[in-house]
From Swiss-Prot:
Residues 1-14, 88-227 are mitochondrial intermembrane. It is found in: Mitochondrion inner membrane. Its main location: mitochondrion. PANTHER family: CYTOCHROME C OXIDASE SUBUNIT 2, CYTOCHROME C OXIDASE, SUBUNIT II. Mg(2+) binds at E198. This is Cytochrome c oxidase subunit 2. Component of the cytochrome c oxidase, the last enzyme in the mitochondrial electron transport chain which drives oxidative phosphorylation. The respiratory chain contains 3 multisubunit complexes succinate dehydrogenase (complex II, CII), ubiquinol-cytochrome c oxidoreductase (cytochrome b-c1 complex, complex III, CIII) and cytochrome c oxidase (complex IV, CIV), that cooperate to transfer electrons derived from NADH and succinate to molecular oxygen, creating an electrochemical gradient over the inner membrane that drives transmembrane transport and the ATP synthase. It comes from Malacothrix typica. GO terms for biological process: ATP synthesis coupled electron transport. Its EC number is 7.1.1.9. The gene is MT-CO2. The lineage of its organism: Eukaryota, Metazoa, Chordata, Craniata, Vertebrata. Its cofactor is Cu cation.
Amino acid sequence: MAYPLQLGLQDATSPIMEELMNFHDHTLMIVFLISSLVLYVISSMLTTKLTHTSTMDAQEVETIWTILPAVILIMIALPSLRILYMMDEINNPVLTVKTMGHQWYWSYEYTDYEDLCFDSYMIPTTDLKPGEFRLLEVDNRVILPMELPIRMLISSEDVLHSWAIPSLGLKTDAIPGRLNQATISSNRPGLFYGQCSEICGSNHSFMPIILEMVPLKNFETWSVSMI
């Protein structure tokens, strides 16, 4: 999860987030090189008295500054499109979870089980135990098996919401009357925190999400106890 004064992204928990972090570094390096070139040109113009007042055209320069930006955009677009297709691709999910946004809580339904569904509300600050996080704790966590592809179907009962887990690289809008789909896959067990990421009313900041990824055996034990 995030911590105070953090400058970078959260630690990657899923293959998608790892790809997003690599793409972030790739794009940042390109932006840094372009910015350095622009600053160099500006400083050269301000510090030198040499000018080319007689130059009417320079086809070589015009060709370069037309082709070079196109190449740079292609270098950014290709990995971006690859990640976009990876995020939409779902192959044989082992589990499907339906998530519904409400004002102001989440409800979850494990569609592969007959009666496994529950609501998830934020725990008020006055009820927190020592070591728990303000505005991030919930009464019912989403328990899922790690290292397996899971399909999350996301919608809303009232207004726009957004189900987001930053460490998984996941943010999917919950839209009334529409069912959006996302893929969840975690490389390791643990607790992963998120929040509603779409302003949805006065209690928008009171819609936390806790995703607990556990080994498959532990998940099976939990699911049996919940039915």
